[in-house]
Amino acid sequence: MNKFLRHSLLLALLTGALSGVANAQTDKLIIESGDNARTRQDAAMDKEQWNDTRSLRQKVNKRTEKEWDKADVAFDAKDNCEKSANLNAYWEPNTLRCLDRRTGRVINP
């Protein structure tokens, strides 16, 4: 019986000690919708930066499109030059032109 009493007392002490640690103060509840002054300010700054870089993005896109068009035209010109019936026509890869072997002048096959 004495042993049972000691174990019960020890269990009661441990339960009391642990229950004090496990209790949390839950009388306050904070709910944020995510729509506060900081997020609105961040969104406004992001929009302003996006608008400020608009012309730069347009320039980059135009340049990319221009380079792609140039490569596309050169590919077609090379294809036409290589398929040409003119035996003196050859494709110059450095200048991206079809030239005459004898004169070195540009020819249109």
Curated annotation (Swiss-Prot):
It holds the Pfam family DUF1283. Residues 38-63 are annotated as: Disordered. Residues 38-55 have a biased composition (Basic and acidic residues). Residues 1-24 form the signal peptide. Keywords: Signal. Belongs to the UPF0482 family. HAMAP family: UPF0482. This is UPF0482 protein ESA_01750. It comes from Cronobacter sakazakii (strain ATCC BAA-894) (Enterobacter sakazakii).
